[in-house]
C-alpha cells in the first residue's frame, strides 16, 4: 500500500469513526447534540490542521481549511437543527454519510474498475457500497434512536426507509457536479427520510389495497405515451422510461386531472424547445439532442411533482401537497418557456448578479422577453391547475409567485454555482421546482 492510499484510508477511517457520535443522539436533547457538532467543527478548524496534516492530500497541505473537514460537522449540525424532534432522522442520515460515503471511497479505490457511465469519476462498486453500508448504518442508528422520538416511529420506517434513503444518496453522489459529498449525501438522504416520516401507515395500506387497477391503467397509458414520445423523438429511451414511471405515479396518486397538468407541462416544454431553432443553432445554444428530453431532465423537472403527488394520498396534508404539486409543474414549465423564449427572441440578455450584458444562453442570464414569457407560462399553468380542480382558485397566486421566485433563484445559482461546476442544469431545475413548491405552500399557510 503506497503512502497516498494509506492517507486516503486514514482520512476515511476518521470520517467513519466520527459517525459513532451519532449513537449519542439517543440520549441528548437537540441543543446538546448541536453543541457536539459545533465542538467538532471547532476542533476541525483549530486543531485538525496542526495534528492531522500528515493525512492531507499533497494538494491540500497549502490550504488553511479543507472543505471536507468543515462541511462534515456543518452537515451534521444542519441535520440536528432541521430535525430537532426527529433525531432518528438526523442519526440515520449521519450514518449514511459516515459509513456509506466512507466505504464508497474505500471500496471504489480498491475494486472500482467498472465506472458509472455518466460520471467516470465514480464506480459501480463504490455506489453499491454506499447503498449497502449506508443503508445498514442508517437503519441501525434509526432503530437505536427510536426511543428518543415521541411517539416512536413505526418499525418499518426505522429498519426499511434508511435503505431507500441510501439508494437515493448513492445515485445523488454520482451526479457529475462539484457539490461536496458531505452536503449532497446527507441532504438527499434526509429529504427521503423526512418525506417518508410524514406518511400515514393507514393511508399507505388503503392506497395499496385500492389503487391496483388505477396503477395498471396508468401504466398502460403512460407506457403508450412514452413510446409515442420516443417515436416522435421528443424523448430519449431513458427519458421515456423515466417519464412513464413519473406519469404512472402522478396518474395513480392524483387521478387524471393531475396527469393532464403534467401532460400540459411536457407539451409546453417540448414546443418551446423547438421555437427559434435556427437562431439557437447559429448561436450554438440549441438544446442537445434536438430538444429531446432525457431521464435527468424528466426527474429534475417533474420528480418533485411525483413526490408531492404521493404525499397527497399517503399523508394527512393533501391540500398542501397538491399546491406543491401544481407549483412544481408550473415552475418546470414556465422555466423552460422563459429559457427558450429568451434564447430565441430575447433582444438583450443580462447576467442576474450584476446586470451586465452577456450572450444568450449564458448561465444565470435573463432577458425581458424570457422573463415575461415565463411569468405568463406560470400563470397559464396555474390557471390550468385551477380549471382541472387540482388546486382551489385561492392557490393561484401562491403557485405563480412560487414559480416566479423559483426561476429567479435558479438564475442566481446558475450565475454563481453552475458556472463553477458546483451545480449542473438538472440540479438547478430541481432546485427551481423545490423553491416554487415550498414558497407556494408557505404562502398558502399565511393566506
Describe each PLM feature range:
Residues 121:
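Short, acidic/turn-prone active-site loops that include or flank metal/cofactor-
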Residues 1-118, 127-338, 342-447:
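Hydrophobic alpha-helical transmembrane segments
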